[in-house]
Design a protein with these regions (language model features):
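Substrate-binding pocket helix/loop in short-chain dehydrogenase/reductase
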Residues: 5-18
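Active-site helix of classical SDR
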Residues: 29, 65
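Active-site-adjacent segment of SDR/Rossmann-fold oxidoreductases
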Residues: 35, 54, 75-87
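Residue(s) in the substrate-gating loop at a strand-loop-helix junction
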Residues: 49
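Active-site loop immediately N-terminal to the catalytic Tyr-X3-Lys motif
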Residues: 56-60
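C-terminal helical subdomain
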Residues: 91, 108-144
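Short, flexible catalytic-loop segment of classical short-chain dehydrogenase/reductase
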Residues: 94-104, 109
Length: 168
């Protein structure tokens, strides 16, 4: 993910991110879901982010793609439940996880990140248990809750300030 002003990112990088985070998730969810529904068995685990619940100044494309994954997963999960299907879709929405993401985006996180193995275990456990949304830490659950309460103009400012600190 690129960290900086939207106007400064390259269209090529934006489209690569959209292809990876949106198109690939959409295609794979659609293809696997048809088979799973016909067998009335299966689990889909889509990797989103806590960013999927917020706007993301300075990482606009990344946040937008994660919003897509979160929204798609939640909506399809609801549809499956309404159909009476045993198939589930889980949106895994962690905060910072120790991966190479930081180096790729050229950022450092101000908040502690969780180990990738810990995140993976939590995601798989929640998916197997049929959870619609999986948020692995209490702190990130508070972030999601807080994002619902804060007016959009303030949330945009907060998110922008957090991203600015990553690149400064």
């Amino acid at each position: 993910g690129y960290c900086g002003e939207f106007v400064s990112s390259t269209l090529e990088n934006d489209l690569e991110m959209i292809d990876t985070n949106v198109r690939a998730v959409h295609i794979l969810t659609k293809l696997f879901l048809k088979d799973f529904v016909s067998k009335n068995s299966g689990r889909i685990l889509n990797v989103a982010s806590i960013a999927g619940f917020m706007p993301g100044p300075m990482m606009a494309t990344y946040y937008a793609t994660k919003n897509y994954v979160t929204s798609l997963s939640r909506a399809v999960s609801y549809e499956l439940k309404e159909m009476g299907s045993a198939v589930t879709v889980t949106a895994f929405c962690p905060g910072p996880v120790n991966t190479e993401f930081n180096q790729v985006a050229g950022v450092s996180f101000a908040t502690a990140s969780i180990e990738s193995k810990t995140a993976a275990r939590m995601a798989i456990t929640d998916a197997l248990n049929g959870k619609r949304v999986s948020i692995p830490t209490f702190k990130m659950k508070l972030v999601r809750f807080g994002a619902r309460l804060v007016p959009d103009c303030l949330l945009l400012k907060i998110c922008s300030n957090i991203q600015q600190k990553k690149i400064n």
